Amino acid sequence: AGKLRLDKSKNDHMRLTFHDSCNVARASRMGNMPGGQFEIPRAILRASCNHYFDMDPETIREGTLCCGGGGGLLTDELMDIRTKGAAPRMKALREVADVHGVTHMAAICAICKAQFSKVLPKFGFDMEAIVSVHQMVSNAIVLTGSTQEEEWNKKAGLAAQAAGAQV
């Protein structure tokens, strides 16, 4: 009790990276350790999926790149500016997609999610490629007392049997 049970395989259709949102990266903390705002979302994502890859280290954490939609720019009339603002992040996303086959990018910030859903197609990505951290957890969570839990327990038992047979 008190722990979430996650089935990472529920997100196997995604190869994921994470966008450090400006406001979270520069103006907040998470947890009780320095840098928690960078490490906690990544730990949650790694616990929720089997295929996680960081973007270029120079473009994440304290060095994160803007989504291009913050600061009051999130309006369709300013789409040209928003697209130019998103270009550096889209370049970093393209690189991790080319190297690791990344198909989705998670973000915490609702502004970033709204921005990316509009600009991703302009850079050759599906607009559905932006997801949230809580969406990844929601996909993977195994609810207690559900048929999903029964399936999970069955899988876990089969995996344990297979591991025992290999020893």
Each model region followed by its residue ranges:
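Iron-sulfur cluster-binding electron-transfer modules in prokaryotic oxidoreductases
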Residues: A1-V167
